[in-house]
Amino acid sequence: MFGISSGQIFLCFHIAAVTVCAIRVLYRQRNTGTAFAWLMVLFVFPLFGVAAYLLVGEARLGMARAKRVEQMNAFYRQFAERHFQHEDLDTDNKMRRRYQGIANVAASVTGLAASNNNAMQLLTQTDEILEAMLADIQSARQTCALAFYIIEPQGRIQTLLAAVRDAAQRGVECTILADAVGSRAFFGSEWEDNLKAAGVRIVPALPVGVLKTFFSRSDLRNHRKILIVDNLVAYTGSFNLIDPRHFKQDAGVGEWVDMMMRCHGTAVLEMAAVFYADVAVEADEHLAEVRQEIEKLDDKIPELLALKRQSGTAVAQVIPSAPDQSDPVIYETIVCAIHAAKTRVTITTPYFVPDELLLTALTTAAKRGVDVVLILPEKVDSFLVRWASRAYYPKLLAAGVKIALFHGGLLHAKTLVVDGDYALFGTVNMDMRSFFLNLEISLAIYDRDTTKQICNLQRDYLKNSSYIAIKSWQQRSKLR
């Protein structure tokens, strides 16, 4: 009727779609390189680019979930303001001034400040990790909360799951939050059925499906590892619920090498807040259940905090990150910590694929005289990550960064130590997925005594590693 062909209508819609996507790229993409790449794809391959951006261009977790997350964050901020007294959070006399700003960066996003009454025990061997966790679960009287990316019910993990089952049968309130993709071997197994039959609440984190793909991204995962018993003791670190003697034995990388921190103090309540918020967002549509549970604790909180003030003197801060946060808080914390370094930065990570900002932080630190050491596994279980990591070696080595390859298995521990008096560890790999896409958790340590434990662990890793010589690596690259 208007003399407009169907082709012209399609062209107009297509131009509009590309324009809208391009505007969203400019406003929503945090990383400049990523934004530029998306713009190139949109304008060079417009049809494919629009479809791809709608599917994976943004870290979408769904509108309903995003609303619940916002409500839970507001609720926990009020909870912290009501219960955490100034004396618990007064760290000025115990924290070096140059780290106070770094702590504020995280607190401004998460609402969780550093606390000064924590006790930390570093566990570095699978046997001692499992034995400690098992003992705490067996002694649980009120609650037992587990959140893990991978739960693989084989070997010694079956003993731990049996302890959770037994705890539920004697009246302990037990909840397991497991990533729907990472723990696919657990879901649908006999262990899931047995635990449910015993009264354990099992919640899949970020479930996937064809229809869900249109509303949220299926590649966003809950990568956190947390165990909390009676709100008095908590664990976090790199350890999944896997038995290294059975897990990925055909990958050719050796057994996974992990660490966990066993914690007492205010940090335990902060980890509990993260856990129950995750459960509520996944399983409590109107957030009524979790509010009721936390309100039940109101009378108990003063007693719990009184116990926690007697726990220890370590200054620690729980830092959770998620793609729906206003800023990539753990990523920003890492970059700030590296820039604050004066003498030494030591990092262990299984997967190292930095962006330009992190790469620049490492290379400029080395150039200004900081001893920068990366401890990476000699072999990893991802072909693409292995070659992507190696692409950065020449620039790092040329700047003076030392790269040590660990020979004792797949080094899965994620640690960062600055100048021997600041440490960051937890679930975060040094790659873009951990920084911008996954739900992660880290623990920042601001005192020398606790940090020394992690320094000693890093030294042990170095004893089983060999440094890459820049000349031999350059020659190797030329030959290839």
Label each PLM-derived region with a short phrase:
Residues 1-332, 336, 340, 364, ...:
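N-terminal localization/anchoring segments of enzymes in phospholipid and broader phosphate metabolism
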Residues 386-387:
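Active-site-proximal loop->helix
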Residues 414:
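Catalytic-core elements of nucleic-acid end-processing and repair enzymes
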Residues 341, 351-373, 377, 382:
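Helical hairpin unit composed of two closely spaced alpha helices linked by a short loop
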Residues 403-407:
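Active-site donor-binding acidic/aromatic loop of nucleotide-activated sugar
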